[in-house]
């Protein structure tokens, strides 16, 4: 049996007076599992906040066709918003394992021990350069293009989502618990800068979320969202 033990979520704009282009789906029961997600509207194109909302709404209706159906809906927007685009990273956890859908640069992590293991790959110019072994990670720190997205739910680029499955035995810790974190780039930027908290903080969803939020709020660089969830497998 799959039991939701704890969850912590937030979704804030970079500045209180501006629109938040992120949307989240806190954990929701869906058939025999739980569904949750983060969508980050792409900056630079008008209507990012509309596109991310469309993605979350379509995910709740039909996860299997969320990418194609969201694009269909975005194409129906008025001319003013014809370039509206969004990323989307979602998780659907059942007793069998984790189904992941991903496009863009939000990130999904699994906690193993006291470390977070990134399970999604960024669809960015930087990641492409890494994949092609043109630069090392260290060299790329000095290069522009970290936030240039190569695919999204968008009419402006070819849509190439990743969809994959991780068996439950690769997710569970020694207590038969599963910890999953989805972050928009405005959140994981601050986690990756210093990817550690105390052991006590790493063992608690609420403490982790509060500690990361405190770190971000000192100098946010973008809208920032987190969906952090803990499950027990009986």
Residue ranges with predicted function:
Residues 1-234:
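PP2C/PPM-type serine/threonine phosphatase catalytic domain
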